[in-house]
């Protein structure tokens, strides 16, 4: 098809192909999901083709600006791009918010950006670079922390990316801030559009202390639990338990992790661990600490 031949969706004029950039990034993730399914079905040739297509996100990365940018029908990056702007090239978001939409290959995105240090700097900027006070934001940009828009779902996984660069305490800090300040027990308690339940789903996962950055990977990046004890009674008859006995609004930082009583050194849990009825214990404190082994392997 045309998209595959061009390796991305292009704009023949400013608004000819609405959301061309965000479509390119999201289709690359869709292709990855197809590849995973094909691999499970033993369709190796199909899997290889769609794994290749899932790398098309690299075709809209501009190393001159370090952002994803739309291309015109000649293949050139469209002039006048600013990551702050909300344009027809990106669905209800700006260049800051869609830059991270490579859930299938975060390690590859880190390399593309220039390595862990540069990626960490860009993450910091995402949460500290505030819109101008006189800037009138669109109605979907709510729950803002810097350029992070919790009220609009494309940003939801970004908080958990600090795990990938050895700074999990920042994931814990921002996850706690969002849970405690942007969700209220009121009739208008959500800071944005629920959109098929995603605002609530983010909260439920994050309150348990983890979140599926790449939902088809079978991994859940560890954040910070909200409650001292959570139990999931599973359909297979087993019970998955999360314990954090000393967690409170100050003790948001994980000091150590045990799974089934054994020390655990990763910044993610697996679907298999959950379904096995594991018990995860978090030792919490008010002091940030590095935990886990990071950047050790590609996403599955």
Regions flagged by a language model, labelled:
Residues 27-36, 98-107, 152-161, 200-206:
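Well-ordered alpha-helical segments within folded domains of soluble proteins
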Residues 6, 27-30, 56-63:
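Glycine-rich, acidic and aromatic/proline-enriched surface loops and short helix-turn segments
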Residues 12-16, 22-30:
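Hydrophobic, small-residue-rich alpha-helical packing segments that form membrane-like cores
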Residues 1-9:
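Single conserved hydrophobic/aromatic residue that forms the stacking wall/gate
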Residues 12-17, 85-87, 137-139, 182:
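Flexible, solvent-exposed coil segments and beta strand-coil junctions
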Residues 35, 41-153, 194:
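Catalytic cores of carbohydrate-active enzymes
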Residues 65, 112, 125-132, 149-150, ...:
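Non-catalytic C-terminal accessory modules of carbohydrate-active enzymes
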